[in-house]
Amino acid sequence: MTRFRTTFLLSISLVIPSTVAGQPAPGLTNSPDAFPGASWQRITTLEKAGWSKERLATARQFAETDSIHTSAVMIVQGGEVVDQWGDFDKKIDAYSVRKSLISALYGIYSSEGLIDINQTLEQLGIDDSPDPLTKEEKQARVVDLLRARSGVYHLVDFETASMAKNRPARGSHGPGTFWYYNNWDFNVLGTIFEKKTGLRIGQAFYERIAKPIGMQDFRPDDVFYFGGPASIHPTYHFEITARDLARFGLLYLHHGRWNGKQIVPEAWVEKSSHANEMISSNGVNLGGYEYLWWIDYGGVHFPEVSLPGIYSARGAGAHYLFVIPTLDLVVVHRTDNDPPIRDAKTIAEISNRGSISEDRAQFGHLLKLIMDAQNRH
């Protein structure tokens, strides 16, 4: 592991609106449904592809300021690279972006009948130690965990300070009735997945997602685990490159299809990208949250950026994956803050460094600058 650095890794995978009156967007050398092959190819003329070179330079200049500390950028349009710089091919911990990655696996394996998301924890034989679950807590269903509404507020060994501060009292809400961003839910989803499929998360992700969509870097052992005394359910982490996350975002942008093949069920992507209720924390509206994705709801999603249909995966420390269907746009933002020694305590400390609201504000402005660089207004 390299020496600790606090830098931001930004990868932007963009696919500009594919049709106008049924015609491909001007300047694209690939078809509207083009996908990268074994490696990414470059667009040769930015202006013909619908981009302002000057506005992209403005976005890059902001990304390189001390306030955001971007270390790499990758911009992809129509399956080709618009621009790139930095360590977009370096594997780093994705933090809570992991949740949207495992959601895709749940979509695949539930459609094949290996996982029933309507089963309860009791039916699945799920408990915890040293503090066991109550009878009521065991009535939470898998789908309640996927929606962060389990009603189980058990201690966990890895969480941010805000998670611990906002945790409700045990027994205060029944299963399925109250949203709380809960690492216990997310960790137990890892336990259930491996129990029901007989597969390690990394192996399943590699075989069913990474290989089919041509991820260049991900391997099965890029998923690692942390345990601790508070719970028997470990935290699973994904080490993944920005360019591989760009492919994952492109997969979701195309409703789970890759080059004509359905990888993640379309119905699952639909459930993951649409909300029907506003969630909030400490009186602040946050938009929607379904199947481990953050979703625009009621015009609420992210600072300076809220478009109908936008949804995102987010991790502590400014790890972001945005999917923006109305613009055929995918945005990935990474933070290269891997510690020299990987343990739960160190990673938890990194998760609590800086201000989450400040990180979001900085990246929200950067995302707006990038979107404004498109010559389509």
Segments predicted by a language model, with ranges:
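Bacterial N-terminal signal peptides
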Residues: T7-P17
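A short, well-structured edge-of-sheet supersecondary motif
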Residues: R55-F88, L321, D328-V332
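Active-site-proximal alpha-helical segments within enzyme catalytic domains
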Residues: S100, V188-I192, Y236-R257, H319-T335
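Active-site Gly/Thr loop motif
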Residues: D217, D222, H274-V330
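Active-site helix/loop module of the DD-peptidase/beta-lactamase fold
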Residues: S111-A148, T197-T235
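Structured C-terminal helix/loop/strand segments within mature extracytoplasmic catalytic/sensor domains
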Residues: Q23, I310-H377
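Active-site SXXK
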Residues: G79, D93-N118, L145, L189-F193, ...
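Active-site-proximal loop and beta-strand segments within enzyme catalytic domains
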Residues: A38, R42-T44, A57-E64, R98, ...
